[in-house]
Amino acid sequence: MMSDCVKLNSREMAEFAADGLLRFDGIIPNEINRQFLADAGSIDTSNGEKGSNRTVKSLGNLMGHSKLPEVTPGTVLNTAYKETTALGELVRLPVVRGAIESLVGPESLVDHHFLHLALPTSYYKAAGIPQRSQHTHQDSTIDPRRAFDIQLFYFPHEVGLDMGGTRYVPGTHLRIVSESAIARYQNIRGQQHVVCPAGTLILMHHGVWHGGGINRTGDARYMFKIRLNPSIPQVRLWDTSDLSARDFEQRPIFFRKEATNPDDIASLLTRPQPWFEGDTGRLEYINRIRFWRYLLGDENFDADYWVTRIENEPSATV
C-alpha cells in the first residue's frame, strides 16, 4: 500500500461497468500540474525542417530531454514513480489511489505511459503538412479477456473547446474491435470531447473508443496517459459496504406500475447510450451484466432478466 485511499462505491463501479470510464474534473492540485508541465518540458514550435518527419523528430527530442521517467513494462505502480515527483504525488492522492485500487487492485502494474501532444496550428503550417485529428481507435489489439486494464488520461492544464481535447464514446468498451477497424468513424452519436479545467483525470477501461482532436490554438495541448494492468482478480476490490440484498433481486420488467429508481444497480447497467440501436443495443446490456458478474464474482447476478433468459437451458432429469 502506498498511501491511504478513498475507494469507489458500488454505484460508481456500476457506472464504470456501463460507461467504461469515470471522470474527475480538476481533482489534481495546481502545484502538481505545474510541476508535471515543468518536468515534461516544452516542444520547439519554431520554423525549421518541413514535412511529417519533423513531428516525429520533435517528439523524440522532447522525450529525450524530458524529466519524466522511463518505466519498464510490468513495473509495480508502487515503485514506478518516486514520491517526490509530480507523477508520484499524483498516483498517491487518496482519491486517485482509491479509484486505481478499486479497479485494478493494490499492486497494479504499469503497462506503459506516454506524453500525448496536440500541436498548434502554427507548427503544421511551418512544417508544410495538413493538420488532422487522430483516427478513432481502440487501444492495443483485439483483446477478448474478461480481465481489463485501465488508462489514466491526465490533463495538466485547462483544455478549451478549440484545443482538440480527446474525444471518446462512452459505453464502447465492451464492443471489441481490431484497434483501427473503426478509424473511418469520426463522429458517433453520444461521443464527448474533453473540455476541462487543469488537473482533470479520466480513468478509462482499455476498450473505450477514442481519438485526439485538432488543436486550433497557438499553444500545445498536453495529455499524459498511464496504462495499468491488474495483478489479481478484479473481484469486489471497491468499497462494497453499500451493496444490499435489493441490489441482487429481480424487479418487474416492461409492465411496471411504478417508475424504477435510476440509481439502482440494474438501472445503471441498463442505461442506454445515444449510439445504441433499439435491437443491437440490448447486446450491450448483456455485455454489461456479464462484466458486472465478473466484478462481483457472482455468475448468478442479472439485471432485468437479460442474461437469465438467454442462458435458460432446461435439462431433463433421470
What are these regions (language model features)?
Residues 208-209, 213-318:
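Non-heme Fe(II)/2-oxoglutarate
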Residues 1-19, 25-137, 142-143:
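Non-heme Fe(II)-dependent double-stranded beta-helix
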Residues 196-210:
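Conserved metal-binding segment of the jelly-roll/cupin
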Residues 119-121, 169-175, 227-232:
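Short edge-strand/loop segments of extracellular domains
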Residues 127-194, 235-241:
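Catalytic core of non-heme Fe(II) oxygenases with the double-stranded beta-helix
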